[in-house]
Amino acid sequence: TVAIIGGGPIGICCGLIARTAGASKIVVFEVNPDRAASLRETFGFTVIDPTKPGAVAEAIAMTDGLGFQRIYETSASIPGFKMVTALGRVRAHAVIIGITKEPAPLDTWKMMHEEMRLTTIRVHQQYAYAAALELVKSGSLDRELMAMITDEFELADAQKAFEFCLNDTKHIKVLIKS
């Protein structure tokens, strides 16, 4: 069972890889309603708005009350970090991918009592790139990876593309073509 906090491109990739690896349940927490709709419709994920009262309890109920075996924090938000330990089950493995702008609290008491493991990622290793390239070369995720590119701009319109990214709420990944 996998919980992903943040449904942006990195969160989507985490979900796709979890599905490929055989995860029985994948729940993505996403605050943006436009992006949440895309996560459901395009990628087939179960999506919960983390700002909704009872969001964590709703997700844990989907695991028969046990909590999640894997938690990926990709939102880089303080509220997202606060959810990490709340979502975990005994001996869960949490992976922090999103980098916050300031120190973020983690419930170390729960981590100790539940024997949770925490991994952080900032610099990727060669073996991870090799595995990712093999997965892409297999073609098994072609449809999903292409669906992540929601908008395209010509190189001459790069400034417009960046402005679009700042103002549009529906995009997932914007491609600038040369």
Which sequence ranges carry the predicted segments?
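Residues forming the Rossmann-fold NAD(P)(H) cofactor-binding site
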Residues: 12-13
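C-terminal hydrophobic helical "lid"/dimerization subdomain
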Residues: 82-86, 126, 130-178
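Residues in the short beta-alpha loop(s) of Rossmann-like NAD(P)-binding domains
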Residues: 31-32, 100, 124
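Rossmann-fold dehydrogenase core element
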Residues: 92-95, 106-147
